[in-house]
Amino acid sequence: METNDMKYLQLLATEYPTIAKTATEIINLEAIMNLPKGTEHFLSDVHGEYSAFEQVLRNGSGVIKRKIRDIFGEELDDAEINSLSTLIYYPEEKMDLIADEMDDIHAWYRTTLFRLIELCQYVASKYTRSKVRKAMPEDFAYILEELLQENYNEDDKKMYYEEILQHIISLDRAEEFISALARLIQQLVVDHLHIVGDVYDRGPYPDKIMDTLMHYHSVDFQWGNHDILWMGAASGSRVCAANVIRISARYLNLDILEDSYGISLRPLALFADEMYKNDPCTYFQPKNEDNIDYSKAEITQIARMHKAIAIIQFKLEGEIINRRQEFDMNHRLLLDFIDYTNGTIHIKGKDYDLLDSHFPTIDPENPYKLTTAEQELIEKIMASFKNCRRLQKHVQFLYAKGSMFLTYNGNLLYHGCIPLHEDGTFMEMKLRGKKFAGKELLEQFEILTREAYVRPPGTKEKKYACDIVWYLWTGAVSSLFGKSEMTTFERYFVADKETHVEEKNPYYNLRNDEKVCKQILEEFGLDGDCGHIINGHTPVKEGKGESPIKASGKMLVIDGGFAKAYHKKTNLAGYTLLFNSYGLQLVSHQPFTSKEDAIKNETDILSTRQVIEMEINRKRVRDTDIGKKLNEQAEDLKKLLSAYRNGLLHEGR
């Protein structure tokens, strides 16, 4: 045995000093590895739609209702199943309604507790006692553990069981106990949650989604293009902050900045009112997709703010393009192509009339230079982003739990794309003087995204990293954007829709090719035959016959459109994916009405399940990434056991 191996075994022996302890741990590890694989839940492109997100999270994409049918399908009718499901999703709110309706609330408590305990036993059966115990609320952990481990068909145990429940009811703790059971069931039906990008965008409550995820038991993120924009703003990128504000103004969602995060937009409002007071800002009128009741004066002011921050954004983008020639984006220096006298712009060999040619803050001789007032404004805005504790807390969580891509249990997860040429080869990009492509490119993007947040302000490293974060939002070789260019300026200022076209990266055609998907999987160190790519970012237009299952099941696109704006395009309100011990299941969801309707009328999101792959042999923990680590531990312990038995090491006490 080599010296290093012996040193490692000696170190291991300090934790397992005897044959008995070593053998016991091996047995424990083998037992865990033989348990069924836990359920993974995949969500993508939530876009700030908290109500629908919360419902899908609470119902486990329909898993809870299916478990109820498994146990009580012959005992309960559909109405009773819906009622029990709603109770588990929203225990406190539902019990408030039930308490007003029930004549004998104690009898209802008793029946409900019996059912919840039986259901909890069922969903806990695939876990170790230790794992279930850790998931329990402290106040009820001892009693819950007793109740979940008993066999209540035995007469002597049944009386003990009923006595416990009777005491819970008589001591007025039934509602708290029901809530504890409901939350435990919610936690146990999903072992791990993957958010495949874009918590943020036009939806009103990304902050609530982040608060929820920060308290979720096991979660990871693959950053999306809208997430990266907010991360950039929180890191100190002025252009990212300008983009965040512009999008929020465009979709009448400034409340997320002012109310949810406490970022004052008063300086922007004052600046806009002064600079654009006689400007109708016709092409900057916000989109009122939710028909929110705003006064004409409010809409007018938001339109001014919208135009003011858009112009600042275009100037800041020009600064980056000029100083980062390696980004190869000079064709996006559109302020250079404007004829300010005639109100036209020259794009790709053609002249177009500008819809709006009122540019009071642009110097035609130096169009990207901020005015003194603009400079002061953006500095105030950046101070607000930097000093917003809640936003910084959320962004830190995104950094802690997130990444550009993730390999997990044989699958590859990423939000946008892997930039490809037409022939399927990986696109290259030069970063800090060296070219990268494929997996290495995404790894470098991640390193620089992290540097943008942690590098000291004012350093060249910080500035470069922040510029890369902006590039990830808009660049042609960005794995998060996936298009040739972002035509934001043209959509505001040019009527001809020919100029609005954003050509998708060849990836989006090639991802239908099984060979290409296998190539991508192998690039990231996965088995091309067994693995899958889980992708978000582009809404699947089911109404036009598009399928989320591509390349013979190698590619699964799970952006079905949580955002209400996409419902008409997708005919859906989102896809989610489940990966349990039996295989992969894609779940499509119809639009969600409201939390209030769900609680009062026991409505749920209508979900349709499609089995993608069914395992011939049920997957066990040993087949997972965690299982491989546990197996390595078991093998090391077997070596330690052999060393004890062969006299190479002596047992301690």
UniProtKB/Swiss-Prot annotation:
Molecular function GO terms recorded: fructose 1,6-bisphosphate 1-phosphatase activity
Catalytic reactions on record: beta-D-fructose 1,6-bisphosphate + H2O = beta-D-fructose 6-phosphate + phosphate
Lineage top rank: taxon: Bacteria
Gene3D superfamilies on file: 3.60.21.10
Presence of keyword Cell cycle: no
Organism field: Listeria welshimeri serovar 6b (strain ATCC 35897 / DSM 20650 / CCUG 15529 / CIP 8149 / NCTC 11857 / SLCC 5334 / V8)
Requisite cofactors: Mn(2+)
Pathway this chain belongs to: Carbohydrate biosynthesis; gluconeogenesis
Presence of the UniProt keyword Transit peptide in the record: no
Protein name listed in UniProt: Fructose-1,6-bisphosphatase class 3
E.C. no: 3.1.3.11
Gene Ontology annotations of biological process type: gluconeogenesis
Keyword field: Carbohydrate metabolism, Hydrolase, Manganese
Family named by the database record: Belongs to the FBPase class 3 family.
